[in-house]
Amino acid sequence: MYLYTLILLFLASVNVNAYADPGACSGNCWTHDPGLYQRKSDGKYFRFATGGGIHIASADSLEGPWTDDGYVLPNGSIIDLNGKNNLWAPDLHYRDGTYYLYYAVSSLGSQNSAIGVATSKTMEAGSWTDHGTTGIESTPASPYNAIDANWIAVGGTQYANFGSYWNNLFQVEMTNGLKVKSGATPHQIAYNASGIHRQEAAFMFERNDYFYLTFSGGIALGYNDTWPAPGEEYFISVCRSTSATGGFVDKNGVSCLNSGGTLLLASHGFVYGPGGQGILKDSSKGFVLYYHYADTRIGKAVEDYQFGWNQLKWENDWPSV
């Protein structure tokens, strides 16, 4: 009986400690669907978040202290859709001396959506120019929802990954960081066939000979009203491919187009519902997974969400936390 108890305690400790706790954060640590980038000129960190005209926070260290710097577009987007004053899901990239920030204009449960773009030379508040829609748009007649954009360049070709619920994740070729390539048609890159297809927040990155597609699944919010059934809250998964445009499979070889996905990060300890993730290639820490989560010691409302980050570990070219 004593041995059996020890075994149970050991298994419980393994489960609790399956993931590393988030890295340290001080100052303004609130975030929601974060976008994170390190400025090329001085290494300063800028963190962007869903809400209003896209929240801006900055710090000299990933650990903080983070300060609240205002908004990217304090007057909202020039895209004339419901939600233009409450922008979502920022995604950052840098190209030829300019920082690009993708954002989504939509409202909960709607497919009347568009992905917009703003540019800056510094990422500072007050420096951003809104260019409006990228041409990635959706209506109830579309097979996808045009939110949650993520940019990647492969050689000289640029792509935007996007999508949420409905038929999940899609990709389309871009002419540049501002507009979809004329005549380009989005194609599906991942799909969760179960239930109401809870999959969103694509983020793709390249390492060694692989392209990695991370995404969020599960229930993203509403935790202050009721806790989802265990395992149904937000979580982060990953697939990989030797091509950026398709063929993504999980660690077991299951296609991401057939509900595949290897769990990268899920609830553990005080961390509940991690998601809305991205990957930063940090100048000193290497590949860093960043995300928001509900800290059960603080609160479970969106207003209580916290900034989480972890350095990725690698085994056989698969990441873990």
Swiss-Prot record:
Annotated S-S bridges: none
Positions bearing carbohydrate: N75, N192, N224
Listed GO CC annotations: extracellular region
GO biological process, one term: xylan catabolic process
Key words, A-Z: Carbohydrate metabolism, Glycoprotein, Glycosidase, Hydrolase, Polysaccharide degradation, Secreted, Signal, Xylan degradation
Keyword Glycoprotein: yes
Enzyme active site: D33 (proton acceptor), E200 (proton donor)
Subcellular location: Secreted
Pathway: Glycan metabolism; L-arabinan degradation
InterPro entries given in the database record: GH43_arabinanases, Glyco_hydro_43, Glyco_hydro_43_endo_a_Ara-ase, Glyco_hydro_beta-prop_sf
Gene Ontology molecular functions: arabinan endo-1,5-alpha-L-arabinosidase activity
E.C. number(s) listed in UniProt: 3.2.1.99
Entry keyword Hydrolase: yes
SUPFAM superfamilies listed in its UniProt record: Arabinanase/levansucrase/invertase
CDD domains recorded: GH43_AnAbnA-like
Uppermost EC category: hydrolase
Enzymatic reactions: Endohydrolysis of (1->5)-alpha-arabinofuranosidic linkages in (1->5)-arabinans
Signal peptide range in chain numbering: 1-20
Residues at the site labelled Important for catalytic activity, responsible for pKa modulation of the active site Glu and correct orientation of both the proton donor and substrate: D148
Pfam families cross-referenced by the UniProt entry: Glyco_hydro_43
Similarity field: Belongs to the glycosyl hydrolase 43 family.
Described purpose of this protein according to its UniProt entry: Endo-1,5-alpha-L-arabinanase involved in degradation of pectin. Its preferred substrate is linear 1,5-alpha-L-arabinan.
Protein name listed in UniProt: Probable arabinan endo-1,5-alpha-L-arabinosidase C
Species assigned in the record: Neosartorya fischeri (strain ATCC 1020 / DSM 3700 / CBS 544.65 / FGSC A1164 / JCM 1740 / NRRL 181 / WB 181)
Gene of this entry: abnC
